[in-house]
Curated annotation (Swiss-Prot):
Residues reported to bind ATP: G210, G212, K213, T214
One BP term from GO: DNA replication initiation
Region (Domain III, AAA+ region): 163-384
Region entry Domain II, spans: 77-162
Start-end of Basic and acidic residues biased regions: 103-112, 121-142
Species for this entry: Xanthobacter autotrophicus (strain ATCC BAA-1158 / Py2)
PANTHER family for this protein: CHROMOSOMAL REPLICATION INITIATOR PROTEIN DNAA
Domain notes: Domain I is involved in oligomerization and binding regulators, domain II is flexibile and of varying length in different bacteria, domain III forms the AAA+ region, while domain IV binds dsDNA.
Name the UniProt record assigns to this protein: Chromosomal replication initiator protein DnaA
Keyword Cell membrane: no
CDD domains linked to this entry: AAA, Bac_DnaA_C
């Protein structure tokens, strides 16, 4: 992690604050490609490469970015977020490669290295016909060579995969009862010899946020590369971005070939993969890899059958492999994770001391995920460094009071809620997920959304995706609507209590 002292400009300090607040993993996934484009007296113009990133950041973090900017710059400005050209960035990153390939290919026709290099780098020729009298032939070759090089560059950029966090290895993964099977399966996949037949294929890991899916996937990718396997790790967002870029640069064939000739494909956050063309391409890629005996590893926040927006063929193929859940972290595992994270923090901040009873309190009381535990330790570190107050149990209780969970609720699945509500109101599951607006469907659907919000740990956007890909505002409207009706209608309140009990017993 960068030290705060290295951030000299307001924008660098904003990025540093975001990294510290949300963690390196999430920062790398969502904010690493966000750029500061323009700064005026009243506005900050930021940009990201995709509409998906723009939508997610606007929905979840834009107000926070504005607040941090005001704090770090001393001036309150409006923060705007735009989408920059979807494929200019990877091409720019590969500019030298493109230039070299084009020069090499045109040289075969012109025989003059310096003249062709000048044409590529300067975008012009010194003479309409060229010094050797063959200028028109060379110019005819250049667009074809440039297009071929551009195709190679885009495909290579995707095949190189999403960036890996150096901290996410098998050695740093803390194993407990809730994740031991997933860890063992992931390790066996990663350690299989190049060319050997996959044992678990595909390997499908699912869990709620912050329980270790990404950690295991990146560990597989890193170990596979070290072991000599051609391994590519991609987030679903990166896969979508690469496919769109390939279409725009007419390099779809190169894109497909780049992915279908690797040994191991690792896809993270599959629940974000949307769009018929994208799903069709993923389906073809998945089939090509599996049929060719190559390893596929996928992670999502739900079971394959619950990915309602995905094609049924994809869900069926994913369900046909080894499906493993990383369950909620048990208290003993939470304590071990805290000890490991604390050890890392003490190496970075030697004066930071947390007594064992405080770590035990955090393990017993805070959150449901590794990220919750990270947040709690970071709060203690901030309190300690900003106030100079030593970490005690009393100080910890005050510092992390907003992170303390009242009880450990039984985990309820959205699938269970859909089944219970559909049966109770005599409608089908398909009705609840459909776009139908009849009264016999709308009210049960809203009640199901309300129950999903009150009985599960899923966010509004996650619930929306599970209900036929709806927007989070639709879920919020349903929750508020039913909440208001429950307060005014005693019969409905009792009915919902019955549904809650049925869902908890499912």
């Amino acid at each position: 992690m960068e030290c705060a002292t290295t951030a000299t400009t307001p924008w660098e300090r904003v990025r540093q604050r975001l990294r510290e607040e949300i963690g390196e993993e999430k920062f790398t996934s969502w904010f690493a490609r966000m750029d500061l484009d323009k700064l005026t007296a009243d506005a900050v113009q930021l940009s990201v490469p995709t509409r998906f990133l723009k939508s997610w950041i606007q929905e979840n973090y834009l107000p926070r970015i504005a607040d941090i900017w005001a704090e770090e710059s001393g001036a309150k400005r409006r923060v705007d977020l735009a989408v920059r050209n979807a494929f200019a960035r990877p091409v720019a990153l590969k500019a030298n490669t493109v230039r070299e390939v084009v020069t090499e290919r045109t040289d075969m026709h012109s025989g003059d290295t310096r003249q062709q290099s000048a044409r590529i780098s300067d975008g012009r020729s010194t003479d309409a016909r060229g010094a050797d009298g063959r200028g028109s032939d060379a110019r005819a070759v250049e667009p074809r060579a440039a297009a071929a090089a551009l195709s190679d560059a885009v495909a290579g950029d995707v095949a190189s995969g999403s960036p890996l966090d150096a901290r996410l290895t098998f050695e740093t993964f803390v194993v407990g009862k809730s994740n031991s099977l997933a860890f063992a399966a992931a390790k066996q996949v990663a350690e299989s010899a190049p060319g050997s037949a996959p044992v678990f294929n595909p390997l499908y890991l699912h869990a709620a946020v912050g329980l270790g899916k990404t950690h295991l996937l990146q560990a597989i990718a890193r170990a596979g590369a070290v072991g000599g396997r051609r391994t590519t790790y991609l987030t679903a967002e990166r896969f979508m971005y690469g496919f769109v870029a390939a279409l725009k640069t007419h390099s779809a064939i190169a894109f497909k070939d780049a992915l279908r000739t690797i040994d191991t494909l690792v896809i993270d956050d599959l629940q974000f993969l949307k769009g018929n063309n994208l799903q069709q391409e993923f389906c073809h890629t998945l089939n090509a890899l599996l049929d060719g005996g190559r390893q596929v590893v996928v992670a999502a926040d739900c079971l394959p059958g619950e990915l309602e927006h995905l094609d049924e063929r994809v869900r069926s193929r994913l369900a046909g492999g080894l499906v493993v859940e990383l369950a909620a972290l048990e208290e003993d595992l939470r304590l071990e994770i805290l000890k490991a994270r604390y050890q890392t923090l003490t190496e970075q901040h030697p004066g930071f001391a947390v007594p064992a009873p405080v770590l035990e309190f955090l393990a017993r009381s805070v959150g449901q995920s590794g990220r919750d535990l990270d947040g709690a330790l970071n709060k203690l570190l901030a309190f300690n460094q900003l106030t100079g107050e030593p970490v005690t149990l009393e100080m910890a209780e005050n510092a992390v009071k907003d992170l303390i969970r009242p009880t450990d609720p039984k985990r309820v699945r959205v699938d269970d809620i859909l089944r219970v509500v559909a049966k109770h109101y005599n409608v089908s599951r398909a009705d609840l997920l459909s776009q139908r607006r009849t009264a016999t469907v709308v009210k049960p659907r809203q009640i199901a959304m309300y129950l999903a919000k009150t009985l599960t740990l899923r966010s509004l956007p996650e619930i929306g995706r599970r209900f036929g890909g709806r927007d989070h505002t639709t879920v919020l409207h349903a929750v508020r609507k039913i909440d208001g009706l429950v307060n005014a209608d005693r019969a409905l309140a009792e009915e919902i209590e019955v549904l809650k009990r049925l869902a908890l017993e499912a």
